Amino acid sequence: MPRGLELLIAQTILQGFDAQYGRFLEVTSGAQQRFEQADWHAVQQAMKNRIHLYDHHVGLVVEQLRCITNGQSTDAAFLLRVKEHYTRLLPDYPRFEIAESFFNSVYCRLFDHRSLTPERLFIFSSQPERRFRTIPRPLAKDFHSDHGWESLLMRVISDLPLRLRWQNKSRDIHYIVRHLTETLGTDNLAESHLQVANELFYRNKAAWLVGKLITPSGTLPFLLPIHQTDDGELFIDTCLTTTAEASIVFGFARSYFMVYAPLPAALVEWLREILPGKTTAELYMAIGCQKHAKTESYREYLVYLQGCNEQFIEAPGIRGMVMLVFTLPGFDRVFKVIKDRFAPQKEMSAAHVCACYQLVKEHDRVGRMADTQEFENFVLEKRHISPALMELLLQEAAEKITDLGEQIVIRHLYIERRMVPLNIWLEQVEGQQLRDAIEEYGNAIRQLAAANIFPGDMLFKNFGVTRHGRVVFYDYDEICYMTEVNFRDIPPPRYPEDELASEPWYSVSPGDVFPEEFRHWLCADPRIGPLFEEMHADLFRADYWRALQNRIREGHVEDVYAYRRRQRFSVRFV
């Protein structure tokens, strides 16, 4: 291989990343126009397009490199020199951290995810940690309450770039001040001020103003979701000022925000203060840098593994028919491997399961479907695997495992946030907690359905409970679009004997679903049945589901709120 080619390859990879992130920012910058035009289908399509950009540009760079090298193989020394040249390009580069992830992706594509060593890849960053604590251009603007909070908020709202009319700006400001007064008290509020991000955060049908409420006793989140009326007028739906509320808004079960971030590391650093419970990976995920979030997630895993004395075990809960799930007892993620063979009732292929997980990645998750990171050739030290889990892996997924002596390589797996399985949660709670869980479960089903997602298998074991008490779906092998399902009423029996027969007295075709049957497995527990009938009886009616299908086919996009209905100003103050 000619000398000097290493620098050309390094420059080609970085230029490829520049092109990718330029397109990323271009798609993101259209969020305001899509919001103002209320083009919600374009919002959904832009989200999918932006997700695809990364892999598309990795592919373009790989083809360029194959042309540059004429398809010749490269030795280890050559690859190390390429990485050295690439590292030298990064100290003054504004998006160095994602550029490192892009380099990793190109390498993995070229070498089929093999020989993934710290010498060849940026397993950990080459740059100083949190390099962007100081940046040339401020990310946010400060607003002080010298003339009262009504005046402050009027300036904040007047500063927004949105070009639509407001329905009633004074009313919304009054509601915000009322909320802040109730939260902080008059004296504390008078001594507080705001710091507001320069860019709005767009997602679904809302534009979010994100800020920091700086009080004498500390800094709080300040989040305002801006929506449109049917007449295209703007209004503020609520004001959120707790870290728990902010954590849910930026949660792992929600779609990525569209926020213009030429310096993503700086934005992540700015967000940390109001999202103290979020990891670096989760913050990058929230702003749409999902591939770099995968890098950070892997780094978090490695750091945890180095500092613990735990072994991987099978995850708690009912064993799945399609996925083998394992975890580290103290780590907040689970690792999911597709089994070699499925239970007989699961008539699907591994490719179908992968397609379902990709569908979830690209779809609006409405706060009810956990995001995942997909890995190939994932290496585990045998000493970190419990004997029982090793036996289970070899029994259920041997075709996906390569034995390297002291290590195993799992050809393909997903990493996902760990939650308490809903069936276990329901066994452990009583009273209001039980009621809240059943309400959350039904709301999760409704919101998924409104977003054109039918879970398929609605058993409690396929849902989890987050640390904030939200119910989230995480078993995707039977997922499909609502519009693909035929919701039917069970025909009346022809004879009394029909109801006692082992086989149904009516024909059942692929895609047929009978909501009346949900009652049999969702209401069997006498503690749960009455609550379900009280709050969610309409889920057992086929006409409820058909009405939702009609709205979807008519092009209606439902509103999705990242907070409780009772927190909306229209409910709370009217």
UniProtKB/Swiss-Prot annotation:
It comes from the Bacteria. GO terms for biological process: glucose metabolic process; glyoxylate cycle; tricarboxylic acid cycle. It is found in: Cytoplasm. Pfam families: AceK_kinase (PF06315), AceK_regulatory (PF20423). Its main location: cytoplasm. Its EC number is 2.7.11.5, 3.1.3.-. Keywords: ATP-binding, Cytoplasm, Glyoxylate bypass, Hydrolase, Kinase, Nucleotide-binding, Protein phosphatase, Serine/threonine-protein kinase, Transferase, Tricarboxylic acid cycle. It catalyses: L-seryl-[isocitrate dehydrogenase] + ATP = O-phospho-L-seryl-[isocitrate dehydrogenase] + ADP + H(+). One of its GO terms (cellular component) is cytoplasm. NCBIfam families: PRK02946.1 (NF002804). Bifunctional enzyme which can phosphorylate or dephosphorylate isocitrate dehydrogenase (IDH) on a specific serine residue. This is a regulatory mechanism which enables bacteria to bypass the Krebs cycle via the glyoxylate shunt in response to the source of carbon. When bacteria are grown on glucose, IDH is fully active and unphosphorylated, but when grown on acetate or ethanol, the activity of IDH declines drastically concomitant with its phosphorylation. PANTHER family: ISOCITRATE DEHYDROGENASE KINASE_PHOSPHATASE (PTHR39559:SF1), PTHR39559. Belongs to the AceK family. This is Isocitrate dehydrogenase kinase/phosphatase. The lineage of its organism: Bacteria, Pseudomonadati, Pseudomonadota, Gammaproteobacteria, Enterobacterales.
